Amino acid sequence: MRNLKTYLSVAPVVSTLWFGSLAGLLIEINRLFPDALIFPFFSL
């Protein structure tokens, strides 16, 4: 039961940090490459 309480207290913190960093990364990508729906990596 103690392990379950530890898991339930750690999981929201880890998921908040993960989604916060992911949102920050997406914001910075959209700031550097605005309106890039398709990255033209494969266009020759």
From Swiss-Prot:
Record InterPro entries: PSI_PsaJ, PSI_PsaJ_sf
Major subcellular site: plastid
A Pfam family reported for this protein in Swiss-Prot or TrEMBL: PSI_PsaJ
SUPFAM superfamilies per UniProt: Subunit IX of photosystem I reaction centre, PsaJ
GO cellular component annotations of the record: chloroplast thylakoid membrane; photosystem I
Cell location: Plastid, Chloroplast thylakoid membrane
Membrane topology reported for the UniProt record: Single-pass membrane protein
GO biological process: photosynthesis
Highest taxon above the source species: Eukaryota
Swiss-Prot/TrEMBL keywords: Chloroplast, Membrane, Photosynthesis, Photosystem I, Plastid, Thylakoid, Transmembrane, Transmembrane helix
Transmembrane regions: 7-27
Coiled coil: none
Similarity-based family: Belongs to the PsaJ family.
Main function: May help in the organization of the PsaE and PsaF subunits.
HAMAP family attached to this UniProt entry: PSI_PsaJ
Protein name: Photosystem I reaction center subunit IX
Source organism of the structure: Morus indica
Highest classification ranks of the organism: Eukaryota, Viridiplantae, Streptophyta, Embryophyta, Tracheophyta
